[in-house]
Amino acid sequence: MPKLKTSKAAAKRFKVTGTGKLKRMKAGKQHILTKKSQKTKRNLRKATMMDPSNEKNMKKILPYL
């Protein structure tokens, strides 16, 4: 059986925590920020965990992460 390929696009966007969960940054912080409040922009700086419903699919495209 051949080696599994890691999705490089996904590997750059996700990190694995010590418990095996996937950590990601929130979207919406790159541009069009003038109409967003300070509170919204502050909350977008925080990392969050991947939703459990997507985690199974992500583990397939990140086999060695």
From Swiss-Prot:
GO terms for cellular component: cytosolic large ribosomal subunit. InterPro entries: Ribosomal_bL35, Ribosomal_bL35-like, Ribosomal_bL35_CS, Ribosomal_bL35_sf. The keyword Flavoprotein does not apply. GO terms for molecular function: structural constituent of ribosome. Keywords: Ribonucleoprotein, Ribosomal protein. SUPFAM superfamilies: L35p-like. Pfam families: Ribosomal_L35p. Residues 23-44 are annotated as: Disordered. One of its GO terms (biological process) is translation. Belongs to the bacterial ribosomal protein bL35 family. HAMAP family: Ribosomal_bL35. This is Large ribosomal subunit protein bL35. It comes from Lachnoclostridium phytofermentans (strain ATCC 700394 / DSM 18823 / ISDg). The gene is rpmI.
